[in-house]
Curated annotation (Swiss-Prot):
Family membership: Belongs to the MrnC RNase family.
Organism: Lactiplantibacillus plantarum (strain ATCC BAA-793 / NCIMB 8826 / WCFS1)
Entries under InterPro entries matching the protein: Mini3_fam, RNase_III_dom, RNase_III_sf
GO molecular-function term, one example from the UniProt record: ribonuclease III activity
A GO-annotated cellular component: cytoplasm
Gene: mrnC
Subcellular location: Cytoplasm
Function comment: Involved in correct processing of both the 5' and 3' ends of 23S rRNA precursor. Processes 30S rRNA precursor transcript even in absence of ribonuclease 3 (Rnc); Rnc processes 30S rRNA into smaller rRNA precursors.
Quaternary organization: Homodimer.
Name the UniProt record assigns to this protein: Mini-ribonuclease 3
Key word RNA-binding present: yes
Amino acid sequence: MQVDYQQLNGIALAYLGDAVYEPFIRQHLIESGFTKATKLHHHATHYVSAKAQAALIERMQAEEVLTPTEVDVFKRGRNAKSHTSAKHTDVVTYRISTGFEAVFGYLQLTQQADRIAELAQWCIKQVDEGRVSSVK
């Protein structure tokens, strides 16, 4: 069944996007030699926390990594009204990270697996090379 991403709100796209992005991070951490649950969780936060995702999407925009459609989807996710409150971060950072996740949800729904992998690998590289920080 094909779902029209344009009919979905940004929160729904972000919900899916969160599930799409995280397996790339988990696989990367396992392949990097982390095997203990506490270490895996600790290191994952450098890639998947709201602060990290906000920093990554801001860098994507600065470096013009995103397509115009992806930028539009990001803005839709960022501007979506959420009834959940941010844990461990401020509302602005949380909303920006929601936009980040919405991009991955959009790419999944439009069956752009290669683009998902490309952006996920780009994000991993940025974090691994210290270009972004999960601390803001």
